[in-house]
Regions:
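N-terminal alpha/beta PP-like core and its mobile active-site loop of ThDP/TPP-dependent enzymes
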Residues: 1-274
């Protein structure tokens, strides 16, 4: 299996549903692998199982993937070429980082031997995206390609969701190796942090104390953010507010968490709020 085919197989395993992107020379092997995958894997309507949506440019692909992620809860997936194709993704990547939208961007890159030589359509995407993405990978060891792509999806969707960029040189895409299935990179520090957050969940005794403090509050207020929407907890927040008669206001990303026509709704706070 080629590196490009491994990328596509991992994307299929992650059940993202749709790929958004705009082709170019440095990502062509992976686009060809998508077409081959769809020829070999048809759904009940005889359509490929990994539809490819091609917009007018890469930035459009990024925002379409972000919208798709918000609407479906799946990780938005984008494939773009090197240089200008990858730099066109900066704005949607930064937008997803700010709004906690899970996104995986697969960028083509010039062959490893040409990196740093100002080759045609080369750009230092790891450096460019490092300040705007949740995490960036540059795949220099093809043996770690499969694990890197799978780990990118893990990082994108866990903890605070966000965009992960994977820069894949063209020769790594053309490399041939063995697909193992299920492999991930050893990122113990990241996984330990997630575990610590999970372990800090309020115990039952503290929940009872919270409810006692709430009953004594003179002017309680619920300030709901985007995490309520991401966690599909909107219904729980509404029931909680109704039960205790607590007004609810939201952040910009929390819009939709509560019905703004209800008497307990205070709409959105902030620069653009009420």
């Amino acid at each position: 299996m080629t590196g490009a085919e491994m990328i596509v197989q991992v994307i299929a395993d992650e059940q993202v549903g749709v790929i958004f992107g705009y082709s170019g020379g440095a990502i062509l092997p992976t686009y060809d692998a998508v077409f081959r995958f769809n020829q070999q894997n048809r759904d009940e309507r005889d359509k490929g199982k990994l539809p490819l949506v091609v917009p007018a440019n890469e930035q459009g692909a990024g925002f379409m993937a972000a919208g798709y992620s918000r609407a479906t809860g799946k990780v938005g997936t984008v494939m773009v070429t090197s240089g200008p194709g990858a730099t066109n993704m900066v704005t949607p990547v930064r937008d997803c980082a700010a709004d906690s939208v899970p996104l995986v961007v697969i960028c083509g890159q010039v062959p490893r031997a040409a990196i740093g030589t100002d080759a045609f359509q080369e750009a230092p995407i790891s450096a460019v995206m490092g300040s705007v993405a949740k995490h960036v990978f540059l795949v220099t060891d093809p043996e770690r390609l499969e694990a890197t792509i799978r780990t990118a999806f893990e990082i994108a969707r866990t903890g605070r969701p966000g965009p992960v960029v994977v820069d894949v040189p063209k020769d790594v895409q053309n490399w041939k190796g063995t697909f193992h299935g299920g492999t991930r990179l050893p990122i113990p520090g990241y996984r330990r942090r997630l575990q610590r957050v999970t372990e800090r969940a309020l115990p039952e005794s503290d929940c009872q104390s919270f409810l006692q403090f709430l009953s004594q509050a003179e002017r309680p207020l619920i300030y709901a953010g985007g995490g309520v929407v991401n966690a599909n907890a909107s219904d729980s927040v509404r029931k909680f507010a109704d039960r205790f008669g607590i007004p609810v206001t939201t952040t910009l990303m929390g819009i939709g968490a509560v019905d703004t026509t209800e008497s307990l709704s205070l709409h959105m706070l902030g620069m653009h709020g009420m």
